[in-house]
């Protein structure tokens, strides 16, 4: 299974200290170079950067067509990491793109890429027995308090749908 991720979902899983969920659900997660750099080059977040570097299930990959990335950024206003994640997913016919930003999700969906986000992965972790309902709800609440843009409506929907 080819799974590609943007930086924001990885940051969310760092915030809830559960990067292991990505490994358990997907085995390997591909990070385009710009995404990897975004996660590992900020001197303010060295501890988190080291956690990303230490994860053997993250694999840094290169996008084949940088012109397509540049064009996508110009046309959509997406950042470099989001654009590389979308282009790499499209070039390599990924099975899943993990992305949270609304605009990036719309672009990916319009390109017929299969997407999920942090909440979808937490739901899948619950369905696969990696988190019980209370643990999943607690993680979503932590993310909400960490300014991860989770509305009250989404929180209530998650609570309602967890097992």
Q: Where do the model's predicted regions map?
A:
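Active-site-proximal, substrate-binding regions of enzyme catalytic domains
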Residues: 1-94, 102, 113, 153, ...
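Acidic, PIN/NYN-like endoribonuclease modules and their adjacent C-terminal/linker elements
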Residues: 45, 105-163
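Short beta-strand and adjacent tight-turn residues that come in two discontinuous sequence segments
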Residues: 99
């Amino acid at each position: 299974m080819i799974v590609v991720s943007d930086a924001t979902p990885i940051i969310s899983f760092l915030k809830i200290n559960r990067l292991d969920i990505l490994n358990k659900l997907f085995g390997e997660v591909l990070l385009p170079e710009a995404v990897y750099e975004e996660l590992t080059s900020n001197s303010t977040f060295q501890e988190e950067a080291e956690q990303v570097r230490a994860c053997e299930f993250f694999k840094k990959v290169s996008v084949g067509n940088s012109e397509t990335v540049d064009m996508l950024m110009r046309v959509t206003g997406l950042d470099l990491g989001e654009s590389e994640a979308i282009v790499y997913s499209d070039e390599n016919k990924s099975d899943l793109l993990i992305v949270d930003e609304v605009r990036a999700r719309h672009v990916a969906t319009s390109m017929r890429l299969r997407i999920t986000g942090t909440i979808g992965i937490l739901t899948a972790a619950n369905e696969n027995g990696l988190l019980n309902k209370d643990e999943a709800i607690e993680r979503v609440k932590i993310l909400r308090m960490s300014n991860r843009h989770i509305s009250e409506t989404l929180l209530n929907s998650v609570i309602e749908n967890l097992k």
